[in-house]
Amino acid sequence: VGFKAGVKDYKLTYYTPDYQTKDTDILAAFRVTPQPGVPPEEAGAAVAAESSTGTWTTVWTDGLTSLDRYKGRCYHIEPVAGEENQYICYVAYPLDLFEEGSVTNMFTSIVGNVFGFKALRALRLEDLRIPTAYIKTFQGPPHGIQVERDKLNKYGRPLLGCTIKPKLGLSAKNYGRAVYECLRGGLDFTKDDENVNSQPFMRWRDRFLFCAEGIYKAQAETGEIKGHYLNATAGTCEEMIKRAVFARELGAPIVMHDYLTGGFTANTSLAHYCWDNGLLLHIHRAMHAVIDRQKNHGMHFRVLAKALRMSGGDHIHAGTVVGKLEGEREITLGFVDLLRDDYIEKDRSRGIYFTQDWVSLPGVIPVASGGIHVWHMPALTEIFGDDSVLQFGGGTLGHPWGNAPGAVANRVALEACVQARNEGRNLAREGNEIIREASKWSPELAAACEVWKEIKFEFEAMDTL
């Protein structure tokens, strides 16, 4: 074979519209905005090339391997309705390109270099189809939804949480006191804020000790199992594991990790530790909006959610649909199903580009958190269903009578919504009525209803299809 040096069009090698995808391929849907004058086939092929075997020129070492076996292929391109010069390009990657059990390696290949590519004005990874053969190389969530319910002995309702505020500046003892008050009032969980690690005003070991004390005291008083998400995120993997070990020694039921800032390698290590040692793992998605908020560049959160289910976590923050943080209902429910369910059909109206079979990988509980309060309870119960954690930070600690009454108000509101739903009432239509009725029997709830009656965070959502 003669070796022909020089630059050649990507589309000659990497655009293959006749390709039949294999069950073992990793499939990706990219939203591609080519530079003016670059045809979509060339742009799509360039994405496939740069995220797999290609480089900018022909190299003679290409002859030493079988490119046809290892190359990514752009197999379908469709224009995006309503957008000028924007396309969805579908790319298939052979499974052999990826290391088993490594989300890190998967992302390094698929979204590594290609996003800085000159021929593209913008590029967004909208969805991935992970083949079952690859899923089986991951351990996934340490416990999953059913095991968590069994550990906590809580069934038939969403779980309630609260982020301890002010997020920075409290001493360990005062922090532990807030934990105790919230749990005693009726919450299931309290939470370290994502940026509470180990700062001068509160070192991690002190916080863990006082929080554990608060948990046990609240458990003794209420007869319910309680937990506090002890944030184990640290500057090194070794330090992170050290914190998780200490949490386990205290008998804590759950630890927490910031998986994007901490990184997938650290997260997978922690998930393995939690699996081996019976700890639940709560995942916070700090930094996600840096990656997923722009509509035409970056990566959609549903991809980050799938990656987390592979890497491992029992809870993950997933937006509220109703609070202060962005998230459109159908789209949010799309990736909530991707987190919880075992098998999800392709449904473009919910942003799901591929049918995904998780082959019994445990599910992840979505966490709704951010600017929500008692008036949102019917909507949240309706939207997220039982397998969710509803987190009210300011919505608990902002109660005029204090933390414990704030927790009582949320618990009463939740129980009222669940009961109404079970009786067949329509939460969407009668939500306010249900909360009003319940507040007659609960002065704590009545006070909460009074404080937050008019608050709304009304802006148009950016994330539309």
From Swiss-Prot:
Keywords per UniProt: Calvin cycle, Carbon dioxide fixation, Chloroplast, Disulfide bond, Lyase, Magnesium, Metal-binding, Methylation, Monooxygenase, Oxidoreductase, Photorespiration, Photosynthesis, Plastid
Residues binding Mg(2+), per UniProt: 191, 193-194
Predominant localisation class: plastid
N6,N6,N6-trimethyllysine carried by residues: 4
Keyword Coiled coil attached: no
EC numbers for this chain: 4.1.1.39
Residues involved in substrate binding: 113, 163, 167, 285, 317, 369
Organism domain of life: Eukaryota
Cofactor: Mg(2+)
Record PTM: The disulfide bond which can form in the large chain dimeric partners within the hexadecamer appears to be associated with oxidative stress and protein turnover.
Active-site residues, record numbering mapped to chain: 165 (proton acceptor), 284 (proton acceptor)
Quaternary structure, from the entry: Heterohexadecamer of 8 large chains and 8 small chains; disulfide-linked. The disulfide link is formed within the large subunit homodimers.
Stated family: Belongs to the RuBisCO large chain family. Type I subfamily.
Function per UniProt: RuBisCO catalyzes two reactions: the carboxylation of D-ribulose 1,5-bisphosphate, the primary event in carbon dioxide fixation, as well as the oxidative fragmentation of the pentose substrate in the photorespiration process. Both reactions occur simultaneously and in competition at the same active site.
Protein name (record): Ribulose bisphosphate carboxylase large chain
Organism expressing this protein natively: Combretum indicum (Rangoon creeper)
